[in-house]
Amino acid sequence: MNVIAILNHMGVYFKEEPIRELHRALERLNFQIVYPNDRDDLLKMIENNARLCGVIFDWDKYNLELCEEISKMNENLPLYAFANTYSTLDVSLNDLRLQISFFEYALGAAEDIANKIKQTTDEYINTILPPLTKALFKYVREGKYTFCTPGHMGGTAFQKSPVGSLFYDFFGPNTMKSDISISVSELGSLLDHSGPHKEAEQYIARVFNADRSYMVTNGTSTANKIVGMYSAPAGSTILIDRNCHKSLTHLMMMSDVTPIYFRPTRNAYGILGGIPQSEFQHATIAKRVKETPNATWPVHAVITNSTYDGLLYNTDFIKKTLDVKSIHFDSAWVPYTNFSPIYEGKCGMSGGRVEGKVIYETQSTHKLLAAFSQASMIHVKGDVNEETFNEAYMMHTTTSPHYGIVASTETAAAMMKGNAGKRLINGSIERAIKFRKEIKRLRTESDGWFFDVWQPDHIDTTECWPLRSDSTWHGFKNIDNEHMYLDPIKVTLLTPGMEKDGTMSDFGIPASIVAKYLDEHGIVVEKTGPYNLLFLFSIGIDKTKALSLLRALTDFKRAFDLNLRVKNMLPSLYREDPEFYENMRIQELAQNIHKLIVHHNLPDLMYRAFEVLPTMVMTPYAAFQKELHGMTEEVYLDEMVGRINANMILPYPPGVPLVMPGEMITEESRPVLEFLQMLCEIGAHYPGFETDIHGAYRQADGRYTVKVLKEESKK
């Protein structure tokens, strides 16, 4: 970080010559000097060059207005104002909070001023670095010799082997040197929450508006289990979102709890809706407790916020209404909601404490902020027994954490602190909205078909758009007003084939075909439904990537309309079965899969499959214990009616459990089986379109088997 920008428009010798001297002095201190053309060019430079560590400008020309604009982007960035002896320094005490240093134009003062700028730059870096990351950088620079773990010793061991050297060269020396042992006492301990690790947790809690925050190094799958193990002791009852992540199913397999499921909605597109407000009411919960064997009043509730498709709840309503001691918002996909006013009242840590309740929010820092994979956080608002909570934390945390993951978690928080973080999130929101509008524009200008966007008719206001009962764009029935909101950065594109009310069109392009084309062109889709594709506009998405996606979508339309051969348009798919796809063209492939979906009446089937839950014969914990005792057998998928499932069955998409361990598909819930059979049939007819179904195993003959409990194990 060594770039200094000079707005050099002084225009007279007595100003320009001191700046030339300063330029040379700064270069001797290894600074890189850049000259923006004007004020707007400077602001663009600050926006696009994060390594800029200072701005030099003429006070008479630019004054406080420029300083305030820069502060809105980065309030910590050092500013150096040059003035002559007669300049008026009309600066208030409030203005002095800006990071401004004043210098006078003078010949022969360049060395002293350059040294002052170097000192201020060092202070700037020290200010923006969070505590653990700062301590880790310091330790690596010191280059101590260690006789402890890890065995590669800062990368030395890798360089003693040809293949190890290739590995070392790829990742680089700092990655190796920062992979250190918990024996390094000056960095404290992740498990003991001591030293710089404790400071990092306190820092993160302040940034995320939490009472207490924990860094988790094995993803939000683990964070969810930590919260659940503490909040729901054996023998208790919990309320849990039926559209929960599979990690929460694993929690219920590990902990002997009785689940009562919240039942979310779903529209014709297969987009997961929210849990209706009625599900949170005391009377509804009391009825479910009465209907559920061995259930008691729930002690804990788990809600997925946002949903996989970007729908956020009015969390204030849930916190106030839900009559349980603790509420866990699984917010893996929205770690950014604390940093824009449009998310106020729509996230777990929003607002203050709730009397008599503990609010948890788990977030996948790595998913949509800037952190290494597996980086996750737990935020807590309310009173917990920290010693007991830490037992659950240690139960799921390695004693050899990777400090790179930990430091990246803290750095992600540091990036979101203050105005710089707000600017990052606002940039994502603006790019997503521009992309949405561009898709709409291209749709109106295209000949024939083009993609559409799942969103309100008018998106002129930057906000989370409400789903209202008097609107039809969302496709949900009986929606509660002021309850669910669409996050603008979660962009769902619609392909032809289905109307929002579930009516199937004669012409259709299943989204899986588009996803395969995009993958051929280096673009990975987050989630694919029957006729929809989800794209996430995270802070890492820039204009270039957004334009690349637009280009790929228009290229797909052009290739599709030309009706190219599959082997030319989708070569990876062609390689799955060259004989089958040899003479097939893209329109034939799309229309045949579309007809198969129409044949099964997908909208109605999907609705019925998720409307009636399978019967819970035993808890997921009890079913898993029987599996551990070997009391299971495999049967064909077609034969699972009337049998107790041993494992969860979870098709991708949408990636939520369809059948839980311990549940039985009955005649009433047969649509669940029919939905799974339809997914399998598409894969059987068209190689390369097999659906990934967790808990169902494809055999050599192409049929699927599932694991069920043996008949005698029902006793």
Model-assigned labels for residue ranges:
Residues H9, Y13-N30, N37-F57, L64, ...:
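Non-catalytic terminal extensions of PLP-dependent enzymes
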Residues E16-R20, K198, T249:
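Short, surface-exposed alpha-helical segments at coil->helix boundaries
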Residues L26, P36-M45, D58, E65-E68, ...:
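Conserved PLP-enzyme active-site core in the AAT-like
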Residues I33-V34, S213, P259, V525:
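Generic structural signal for residues in well-ordered beta-strands
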Residues N174-T222:
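Conserved N-terminal alpha-helix of the aminotransferase class I/II PLP-enzyme fold
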Residues V216, D241, F262, I303-T304, ...:
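Generic beta-strand/beta-sheet core signal
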